Amino acid sequence: MRGKQVFMESLIAHGVEYIFGNPGTTESPILDALLDYPQLRYVVALHEGVALGAASYYAQTSGKTGVVNIHVAPGLGNALGMLYNALKARSPLVVTAGQQDTRLRLRGPVLGHDLVAMAAPLTKWSVQVERADEFALIMHRALKIATDPPAGPVFVGLPIDVLEQETDGEPLSPGRLYRAPEPAPAGVQAAAELLLGSQRPAIVVGDDAVSAAADVAALAEHLGAAVWCEGIRTFQVLPSGHPNFRLGLPFDTVAIRKALDGVDVALLVGGPFFEEVWYAPGSPLPSGARAIHVESSPERLAHNLAVSVGLVSHPRAALSALRTAVDRGASPAFREAAARRNDALRALKAQDGEAQRARAAKRWDNAPISVPRLMAEIELALPPDAIVVDESITAGPDLARTVQFEHAGDYVGARGGGIGQALPGALGVKLAHPDRPVVALSGDGSAMYSIQALWTAAHHDLAVVFVILNNREYRILKHNMDTYRQRFGAKPDRGYPNMDLVSPDLGFVEIARGLGVEGLRVSKPGELRPALEKALGAGRPFLLDVAIEGRA
């Protein structure tokens, strides 16, 4: 058996179905071997960032390990931005790259570099196979480490000569690994006592809580607690319409503290807590608030905050145990107070809905199209089982307040914050859920980072609807320029240099056509609904270039 065969059969043994890649010469052994392993499907991308982004979203939404194969040092360099996002999203990925013949190492070969060192800062483990006899163990370990909590990408370098070496090694079986720890009973009791003594509890959920969505909802209702998501997230854990759900937190300490004003006990579940953009001193939690942190890996427990109680546990196990302990210890007075808190949250939810509908009505006929109108039309047009891949950035608050996501997997965000994720990400989501409609929402600036994804959609016949929110600018940068000038005392009202995407305008319909995808320009509000209906009914990749309002 050759090294390339051990590589391929290791993937199959671990349930891998897709290899996402952009081929190169050093990957020739793998590409050639694919002819002998038809159960592995190669998803071709025209840029390594697209391949890695698609694989990351596939891994996040399928529950399976994503595998990427890219080309030597320049290819890995092209993929590093998406690799950063995958690390932040904790995507279980095995990223591989072909490497030049090891016998050329000292001669400085074309395209050669230290791939292990390049990948190391953005991976859980980075290694190169030096002999074919190492293949079985390295692949077994790579596929395990990628899925060990906290999940994340690993890197394996594949020299072309080692892929062709003979070996007696055979792929190792993954086995059944039971890795979901139960919370310590003493910790559960301590956390329950804090919650039962709270006058205004709140729950903040990270992406790891998605597997415990029902438990989050049940505990929130038991406590009468508001539930917040992190500002940048992959998943929306609770349904949009759940009365306790308060959407996403902002990105600086002062604003987070304001959102959580009055909270005396915060239960933080399955996330790093908190990711900020702007510095401010002090804790994100209100003065005097106590924190309980549930985390599946010790390394992230109490990492950024001092907590009163920390539990290393699978979120589902911890929340189930907490709910039982709270239910057992709740007094009649606590239950009455929790019911009042739930009533108040329900009323606040209704007020928020009315406010958003009024916001949309006020700007319903605006041209360029208002963002609230666009989101309202999307909500009306979406099939009930649709998945939205969101990189709408400044349009995100209107999306969150308007579109009703009923299940945790209905919304997939752009964790990490590096732009260009939605277009390739939607490809991975569609491969993970081929029977569900998938709609990608992307700003115009973000789309241009990974526009080659349209070709992959056409090439593999992936019926994704790509909606480009085209405001002809980097709107988020204009908002952040205002914030910068205010925070650092710079002169205001000096304009926004190099933040407009004009002269020439970006022609997304023309670009899409050149990449094999039909497109339609939407510039008037009345055109939105028929355009969305056409795109969603096309049964093939389709792009809508929607002219929306700019900075407001």
Question: Over which residues does each language-model region extend?
Answer:
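N-terminal alpha/beta PP-like core and its mobile active-site loop of ThDP/TPP-dependent enzymes
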Residues: 1-332, 336, 381-384, 463-466, ...
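Active-site diphosphate/adenylate-binding microenvironment
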Residues: 4-8, 12-17, 22-25, 30-37, ...
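Thiamine diphosphate
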Residues: 96, 106-111, 222, 257-260, ...
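Phosphate/pyrophosphate-binding active-site segments
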Residues: 133, 288-392, 491-496, 517-519, ...
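Active-site/binding-pocket entry motifs
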Residues: 162, 233, 394-396, 550
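Conserved short loop/turn motifs at secondary-structure junctions
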Residues: 206-211, 363, 443-445
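Hydrophobic, well-ordered secondary-structure segments
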Residues: 277-280, 322-330, 336-356, 423, ...
